[in-house]
């Protein structure tokens, strides 16, 4: 019996399709697949932004906006709807479930201990890791790299268009303080937001000497809307 078994042909492991499988994918089907193409070298196999590539809807980033791929002199476009999906994606179903309907942030190195019960809350937190909107005033420290000169890639941007619009309003404040000074002249302080102006009135003018109007300029009724370049939808 033993001689018959020894006569059997040996298992050709080189030609076996099973031997060519990735060991990691066999051990755990939930791990992200690794692109075996030549373009996928060792430098970006486990890059911190690889997990971005297949988030739904508004979290999809085009390759030219991926911070891991933007050079110091690359011009960042203002809009991000020219998404060019890459082959590696992360699905919401891959998130770690830590309780009944609760998931934690999947971003590598995120120190948040929050647990999210819905996709909307998770997306709102997740995109805070990627400040992909930059100030469009050329000499602002929070402007992205552009034609006016490179800025370090670590410069802080903004997670939403609304946050950027609120910041840009500081470059061109149009809300004037409505109070009068002791000489009866209009206060010259200008603000980009109504709440800041009202706080100034309360602290400095003690809510007195109003000039009869609370706002000034075209931006007063909607101070959080981007009035400098375009009216953008609230995010």
Curated annotation (Swiss-Prot):
<keyword id="KW-0863">Zinc-finger</keyword>
<dbReference type="GO" id="GO:0005634">
    <property type="term" value="C:nucleus"/>
</dbReference>
<keyword id="KW-0804">Transcription</keyword>
<feature type="region of interest" description="Disordered">
    <location>
        <begin position="14"/>
        <end position="45"/>
    </location>
</feature>
<keyword id="KW-0479">Metal-binding</keyword>
<feature type="zinc finger region" description="C2H2-type">
    <location>
        <begin position="175"/>
        <end position="205"/>
    </location>
</feature>
<dbReference type="GO" id="GO:0008270">
    <property type="term" value="F:zinc ion binding"/>
</dbReference>
<protein>
    <recommendedName>
        <fullName>Transcription factor hepR</fullName>
    </recommendedName>
</protein>
<comment type="function">
    <text>Transcription factor; part of the gene cluster that mediates the biosynthesis of heptelidic acid (HA), a sesquiterpene lactone that acts as an inhibitor of glyceraldehyde-3-phosphatedehydrogenase (GAPDH) and a growth inhibitor of the salt-tolerant lactic acid bacteria in soy sauce brewing. Both hepR and hepS regulate the transcription of the heptelidic acid cluster, but they are not involved in mutual transcriptional regulation and act with different mechanisms.</text>
</comment>
<keyword id="KW-0539">Nucleus</keyword>
<keyword id="KW-0805">Transcription regulation</keyword>
<keyword id="KW-0862">Zinc</keyword>
<dbReference type="InterPro" id="IPR013087">
    <property type="entry name" value="Znf_C2H2_type"/>
</dbReference>
């Amino acid at each position: 019996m033993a001689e018959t078994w020894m006569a059997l042909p040996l298992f050709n492991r080189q030609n076996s399709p099973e031997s060519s499988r990735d060991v990691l994918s066999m051990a755990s089907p939930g791990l992200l697949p690794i692109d075996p193409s030549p373009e996928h070298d060792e430098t970006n196999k486990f890059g911190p932004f690889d997990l971005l590539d297949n988030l739904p809807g508004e979290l999809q980033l085009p390759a030219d906006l991926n911070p891991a791929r933007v050079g110091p002199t690359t011009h960042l476009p203002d809009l991000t709807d020219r998404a060019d999906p890459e082959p590696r994606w992360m699905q919401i179903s891959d998130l770690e479930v830590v309780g009944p309907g609760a998931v934690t942030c999947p971003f590598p190195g995120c120190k948040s201990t929050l647990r999210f019960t819905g996709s909307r809350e998770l997306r709102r937190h997740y995109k805070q890791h990627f400040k992909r909107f930059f100030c469009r005033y050329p000499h602002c420290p929070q402007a992205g790299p552009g034609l006016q000169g490179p800025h370090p890639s670590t410069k802080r941007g903004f997670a939403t268009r609304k946050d950027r619009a609120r910041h840009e309003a500081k470059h061109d404040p149009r809300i004037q303080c409505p109070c009068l000074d002791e000489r009866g002249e209009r206060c010259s302080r200008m603000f980009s937001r109504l709440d800041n102006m009202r706080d100034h009135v309360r602290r400095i003018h003690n809510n007195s000497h109003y000039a009869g109007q609370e706002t000034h300029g075209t931006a007063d009724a909607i101070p959080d809307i981007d009035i400098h370049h375009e009216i953008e939808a609230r995010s």
